[in-house]
């Protein structure tokens, strides 16, 4: 079975809480605060495993959670950092945010890894909050919260050459002839419902991987049939071999088939459409009118496709020359990473300092991830904490922005469920 998509839930570890503690030793008066910091929460990290070839494991386990950080303690003891959780994925895995469908990472090399959920920062102990005017702070920061999200994993085949074409044109037969792959072969449409891979060995030439991409039909670029799933597998190939049934035994016109498949490629991705393409006019052993091939070749060449081979996968006629041309083309094309456009790329929000302010009547509402983190870190009922809270708002520019918006004495400022009256 070839599983090429999976959806999993990942959750990093929460940061450990800072400690509120004071030094208590005989003969040492006013020992001062000695609460240690909390440990950092563990990250969730996706790591490429070159030995994995499918996403099948993720059908059995779908939720992954890293260790939280340990809490701080007295005597300035710091909490233990939580262990990172490493999740192995196959090479060629695309990571997407499940909510936005934006691409987060392209794990295409053996050494690639990606932190998909960052552990929360450990909270500061009260020994961190001493100042010349605050010698005995009796508050500490709780650990920062964990990150959690659903992500989608897509495995895109790392094949060098992709066999494309309508169903039942002989792609699977060709793959079985040029490699040791044994795909299912039968005389009906959509025999191949999953991509098959094979390795082609040519004496004196580097081996290359060839993939039989399941049949693409009209409307594939719009999701008709299994179209989008099939087209996804073609993206990483460097050379395409477009297999055409030149015999027309099913009543289809070879040139019309050629145009339709290329139109679907173009609609899906112009870059995919522009990829080097070799035309393989297959089933020539069943062709009784040689002029039909020459006519087809002339029409195709007008579109700029000058590599047209007459082959028969069943009798192996012309197959060796076809594979040698594919190898020659590959030697001229560098392996490149999948290009990700800015609109498709997932932008990691800088969560710590993100906020917005809006006004409703005489109430100014401050909201955002910065607010959530700040309120999580302080006890607004404690005078020391409250002074620290106002200092942070001032340092981060919140107070200045409120004044620029025209806030006046007595106006209410609301941060989540906490409100206070503004005073100049």
UniProtKB/Swiss-Prot annotation:
Keywords: Cytoplasm, GTP-binding, Hydrolase, Magnesium, Metal-binding, Nucleotide-binding. GTP binds at residues 165-172, 190-194, 212-215, 282-285, 312-314. Residues 345-424 form the OCT domain. GO terms for cellular component: cytoplasm. One of its GO terms (molecular function) is GTP binding. One of its GO terms (biological process) is ribosome biogenesis. Its EC number is 3.6.5.-. Residues 1-158 form the Obg domain. It is found in: Cytoplasm. Mg(2+) binds at residues 172, 192. It holds the Pfam family GTP1_OBG. Belongs to the TRAFAC class OBG-HflX-like GTPase superfamily. OBG GTPase family. Monomer. PANTHER family: DEVELOPMENTALLY REGULATED GTP-BINDING PROTEIN-RELATED, MITOCHONDRIAL RIBOSOME-ASSOCIATED GTPASE 2. This is GTPase Obg. It comes from Clostridium botulinum (strain Hall / ATCC 3502 / NCTC 13319 / Type A).
């Amino acid at each position: 079975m070839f599983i090429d998509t999976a959806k999993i839930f990942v959750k990093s570890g929460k940061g450990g809480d800072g400690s509120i503690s004071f030094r208590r030793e005989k003969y040492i008066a006013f020992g001062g605060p000695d609460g240690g910091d909390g440990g950092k929460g563990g990250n969730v990290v996706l790591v490429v495993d070159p030995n994995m070839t499918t996403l099948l494991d993720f059908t059995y386990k779908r939720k992954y959670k890293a260790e939280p950080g340990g809490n701080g303690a007295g005597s300035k003891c710091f909490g233990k950092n939580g262990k990172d959780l490493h999740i192995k994925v196959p090479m060629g895995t695309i990571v997407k945010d499940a909510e936005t469908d934006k691409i987060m990472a392209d794990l295409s090399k053996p050494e690639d890894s990606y932190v998909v959920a960052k552990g929360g920062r450990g909270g500061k102990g009260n020994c961190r909050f001493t100042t010349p005017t605050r010698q005995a702070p009796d508050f500490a920061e709780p650990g920062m919260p964990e990150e959690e999200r659903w992500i989608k994993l897509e495995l895109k085949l790392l094949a060098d050459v992709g066999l494309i074409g309508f169903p039942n044109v002989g792609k699977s037969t060709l793959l079985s002839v040029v490699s040791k792959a044994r795909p299912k072969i039968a005389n009906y449409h959509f025999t191949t419902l999953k991509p098959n891979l094979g390795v082609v060995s040519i004496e004196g030439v580097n081996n290359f991987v060839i993939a039989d991409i399941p049949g693409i039909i009209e409307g594939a670029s719009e999701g008709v049939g299994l179209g989008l799933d099939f087209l996804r597998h073609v993206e990483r190939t460097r050379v395409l071999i477009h297999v055409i049934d030149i015999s027309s035994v099913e009543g289809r016109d070879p040139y019309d088939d050629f145009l339709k498949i290329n139109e679907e490629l173009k609609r899906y991705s112009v870059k995919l459409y522009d990829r080097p393409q070799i035309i393989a006019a297959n089933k020539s052993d069943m062709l009784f009118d040689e002029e039909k091939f020459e006519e087809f070749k002339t029409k195709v060449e007008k579109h700029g496709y000058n590599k047209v081979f007459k082959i028969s996968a069943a009798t192996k006629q012309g197959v060796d020359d076809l594979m040698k041309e594919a190898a020659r083309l590959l030697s001229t094309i560098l392996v490149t990473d999948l290009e990700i456009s800015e609109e498709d790329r997932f932008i990691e929000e800088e969560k710590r300092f993100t906020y917005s302010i809006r006004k409703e009547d005489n109430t100014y509402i401050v909201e955002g991830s910065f607010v959530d983190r700040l309120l999580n870190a302080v006890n607004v009922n404690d005078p020391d904490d409250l002074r620290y809270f106002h200092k942070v708002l001032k340092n981060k520019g919140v107070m200045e922005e409120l004044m620029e918006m025209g806030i006046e004495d007595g106006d209410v400022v609301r941060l989540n469920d906490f409100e206070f009256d503004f005073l100049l």
